[in-house]
């Protein structure tokens, strides 16, 4: 997702310091505007955007996998890093800047065929991953750092990959401390087709 890619650039440029995020976000918007939402990954246009961002000293490894020819396919981590419906999601105790990442999760068999879909929360430790992409393992490979469910909707004649492509995700978080967050994302805005991933 273009917006998610921009947020990864912000984390990287902030070196994990949340207090720098707003100023960097404003600079990104000044330079990029909404230009990433219509850019097809791996296209000549994407290469042009890359060159412009390199000149502005705004290019990032995150943008490379977001709009470059090769996607990042991250298979998450060890089995204990994912939990099911109703379980508490784990946050590494060193993280002070983190957020949920609601996503569509594809259920894929051993032959690489997509057989269904479910919901997922891929917890993002922005302060850890933002310091260095080489810390992705520390940021992602933690007990209960992702949640999936409540069930896998198997594909059949009534539900398939086109339904996934049209899906709208909504997330509402209400913290015990009064914090509230409501967000949504549309699979129609994804930078790459789910089957390409």
Regions found by a protein language model. Name each.
Residues 1-163, 167-172:
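Active-site microenvironments in enzyme catalytic cores
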Residues 155-197:
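A beta-strand-loop signature enriched in Asp, Gly, Thr, and Trp
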């Amino acid at each position: 997702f273009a917006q998610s890619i921009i947020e990864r650039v912000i984390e990287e440029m902030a070196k994990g310091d949340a207090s720098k995020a707003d100023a960097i976000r404003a600079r990104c918007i000044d330079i990029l505007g909404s230009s990433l939402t219509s850019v097809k990954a791996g296209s000549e246009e994407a290469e042009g955007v890359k060159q412009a961002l390199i000149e502005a000293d705004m290019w990032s490894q995150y943008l490379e996998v977001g709009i470059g020819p090769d996607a990042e396919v991250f298979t998450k981590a060890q089995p204990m890093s994912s939990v099911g419906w109703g379980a508490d999601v784990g946050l590494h105790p060193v993280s002070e800047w983190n957020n949920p990442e609601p996503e569509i999760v594809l259920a894929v068999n051993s032959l690489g065929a997509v057989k269904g879909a479910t919901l997922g929360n891929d917890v993002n430790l922005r302060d850890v991953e933002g310091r260095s992409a080489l810390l992705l393992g520390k940021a992602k490979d933690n007990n209960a750092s992702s949640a999936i469910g409540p069930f896998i909707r198997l594909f059949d004649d009534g539900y398939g990959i086109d339904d996934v492509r049209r899906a709208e995700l909504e997330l509402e978080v209400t913290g015990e401390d009064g914090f509230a967050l409501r967000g949504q994302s549309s699979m129609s805005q994804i930078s790459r087709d789910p089957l390409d991933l």
